[in-house]
Amino acid sequence: LHNFTLVHDDIMDEDDLRHNVVTIHKKWDNAHAVLAGDGLGALGPIFIGKIKRNTLDILIRYNEVILEICEGQAYDMEFESRDASVDEYLLMSAKKTGSLFEFCFEVSSLISDDYLEFKSELKELGRNLGIIFQIQDDILEMSTSSENMGKGTSSDIERKKKTILSSMALDHDKEKWASLQSKIEDFSLEEKKAMLKEYYNSSGIIDRSNGLLLNLEKKCKDIINLLPDTIHNDMNDLLNIIVKRKN
């Protein structure tokens, strides 16, 4: 499911690299990439069919998550032509990324009696981890290199995609943000990125974004404390891997 969405995402974003590997649509063409993505998506139900319990429930959730990811991606594309508030950004992130993490955590409660009573906590933990992951992507793409990220880091600017940084800048000072957007319009892509990076730092947007990450991290830790003691270490390790990632 994850790889299926990435293949289609690369087509829509016209990205040339994914983890420093040429994307499928770039190596071949869009038609072959669509087929590859569809094929990967079809593998999910085949594997789910081999699960011995709650198979139908998991299959239904699998398809519900695909719909939710599509909703999130539709928001992402819509926001290319208009501003998006922080609340709208978080809704988009919860759907396009958080829903996938949530599904992975939820399945554990559906295949094991040990975690069934913690289904709602696991779902909430997964969704918040997904939002953290998406916010980090936005910050890293602004602050690090394409080589480090393994993909282009200027495509969001080129396509006028909305990130946590742009949404926070909008909510922080709508007039200043509109003025900056107008000012950078005729500059090169790299110059735009440098000017945006300077603004995000000088106006405190980066600090606010990191503050949001800390709040989400605390929320995840609080949820982990509600889960069985036997998985506390594993869940905290996973949280640390996600919040401390550099690419």
PLM features: residue spans?
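Short, structured helix-loop boundary elements
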Residues: 59, 119-122, 193, 206, ...
